[in-house]
Amino acid sequence: MPRYGASLRQSCPRSGREQGQDGTAGAPGLLWMGLVLALALALALALALSDSRVLWAPAEAHPLSPQGHPARLHRIVPRLRDVFGWGNLTCPICKGLFTAINLGLKKEPNVARVGSVAIKLCNLLKIAPPAVCQSIVHLFEDDMVEVWRRSVLSPSEACGLLLGSTCGHWDIFSSWNISLPTVPKPPPKPPSPPAPGAPVSRILFLTDLHWDHDYLEGTDPDCADPLCCRRGSGLPPASRPGAGYWGEYSKCDLPLRTLESLLSGLGPAGPFDMVYWTGDIPAHDVWHQTRQDQLRALTTVTALVRKFLGPVPVYPAVGNHESTPVNSFPPPFIEGNHSSRWLYEAMAKAWEPWLPAEALRTLRIGGFYALSPYPGLRLISLNMNFCSRENFWLLINSTDPAGQLQWLVGELQAAEDRGDKVHIIGHIPPGHCLKSWSWNYYRIVARYENTLAAQFFGHTHVDEFEVFYDEETLSRPLAVAFLAPSATTYIGLNPGYRVYQIDGNYSGSSHVVLDHETYILNLTQANIPGAIPHWQLLYRARETYGLPNTLPTAWHNLVYRMRGDMQLFQTFWFLYHKGHPPSEPCGTPCRLATLCAQLSARADSPALCRHLMPDGSLPEAQSLWPRPLFC
């Protein structure tokens, strides 16, 4: 059976060869125009599928060049050049083709023609099985052609993206800056430790639940499709056990019963003062999801959370898998059937019992909101899809989509004026965002370091963090973002959740994180016939890592301790994967790349890792800094 994409926990190479003559009727110019536009669509689909399949990539998978720019497509997917014949696409030919594309799109973009050729390319490049190729092209084609029509990349930008900087400048996501108030920044004031006996709040953190309503015990966990362990996956070979009852260590999501087990078994970890829930409710079957499927997942899992958590307030954030097509989050100026109104309205209805009127108003507009859980604490839920590298709608305009960052500045300034503290929750971590968005966010965090008490994200499915530094020297740790592990097993992990201990609800509270605990379901034990699932404490951060506190400097120091202490790093590596690390060892390049990621809360900023190498060699540190595709 042919295999599509990559094996588990590896990057997904895309390959193929130049398309031969096609018998489709039409002028050669239109044929080539459709072919290259379809190639762009096929590559976008490859990105979407690999984004839904790749949890961890080797350190060498996505290096930065010595200049600090992301690797070009032909470097990220080297086989594309060899088999597709990428070298035959010269710079003049490329610019000529994209000139024809832009002229044609201004006249009459033919979605059906583009989709037909994209399906052929998807099959030719072996991006996915034929049925998946057909389904995902039909799902994406309308939005992708609409985005291309509205954005109309210049030939220089498109060919710079495809062939590298020698052919043109490809940074279509141009630089931009938000405005900060003229109010001077107060002197940095680290939080004081709470007094002995001060109240402590416990916050349950749920992320990346990924419910698969088609999960089926006994099916093939290593099928050819991007998601397995489900109806249609077939039976495994005799040498391989089928999908387990509670989940599987493979490219599989969770049955509803496992989410019910998680929520019903929270008692030993509680009680909880509130819940932060940072999205990704649907499964990774991104090639045939409908809006009805996404809304079903939203309402079903929201009802389940409400059933088991009762009166505990729950504050959600929007994940990248909530929409369909996956990662499709147009800014609010996109209206009509292409807009996200269908999703935001459904979220507002589902979450209305938890959110006040003003929060529901901005949720309906752009998927973000702010509220006050306690006196003195402001919670801000960001729609991180407006920073996403995979949100193709940002090709039209990536400058502060929905005005969200400028709105964030206003919220933080108002909190500073009141003397409040702020928690930020979101799905995609800031270090994984588009460069300009990420750098602006970094600047905002630095400006409001005294006000911003904590940041919480998900998305990567693994257990990590991102340290922020002062912008002047990049040496003083001033904030940390906590990236919690997923509930889903995707890919090859135990199910898990996080609990944060926070300086509690009292006058003068710092509201900072005091410690955190991670709980897992050991699938090896749970899937034994007749076993009762037991959610167990995996570790406590301060105890396990010997941290004096959980302030930014402590996490910075932990990274540099792990640089020289292999045993400590192996502990981190084990916990990073929720107690089920990959069988491949993490050697020195992998270790340094992983540590670099913990220092990189700002995208495309390899200088943050300049001290990781023993000799301080910046080029080497850059080459080890991965930006893998995550779910």
Curated annotation (Swiss-Prot):
- Family matches, as Gene3D superfamilies: 3.60.21.10
Q: Which Pfam families match?
A: ASMase_C, Metallophos
Which residues bind Zn(2+) 2 per the record? Answer: D280, N320, H427, H459
Is the Zinc keyword given for this protein? Answer: yes
Q: Indicate how activity is controlled.
A: Hydrolysis of liposomal sphingomyelin is stimulated by incorporation of diacylglycerol (DAG), ceramide and free fatty acids into the liposomal membranes. Phosphatidylcholine hydrolysis is inhibited by incorporation of cholesterol, ceramide, DAG, monoacylglycerol and fatty acids. Antidepressants, namely amitriptyline, imipramine, desipramine, fluoxetine, sertraline, escitalopram, and maprotiline inhibit sphingomyelin phosphodiesterase activity.
> How the protein is affected by changing R476W?
In NPDB; some patients have a NPDA/NPDB intermediate phenotype
Entry EC number(s): 3.1.4.12, 3.1.4.3
On modification after translation, the UniProt record reads: Proteolytically processed. Mature lysosomal form arises from C-terminal proteolytic processing of pro-sphingomyelin phosphodiesterase.
> What effect on the protein does mutating R378H have, as reported in its record?
In NPDB; reduces enzyme activity; some patients have a NPDA/NPDB intermediate phenotype
Q: What is the effect of changing D253E?
A: In NPDA; strongly reduces enzyme activity; intermediate form with clinical features of both Niemann-Pick disease types A and B
Cofactor(s) of this protein = Zn(2+)
Q: How is the cofactor bound?
A: Binds 2 Zn(2+) ions per subunit.
Domain Saposin B-type, by residue range, is: 87-171
Query: Which parts of this chain are annotated as the region Disordered?
Result: 1-23
Phenotypic consequence of R610C: In NPDB; uncertain significance
Assembly and binders: Monomer. Interacts with SORT1; the interaction is required for SMPD1 targeting to lysosomes.
Report what the protein is called: Sphingomyelin phosphodiesterase
Report the source organism.
Homo sapiens
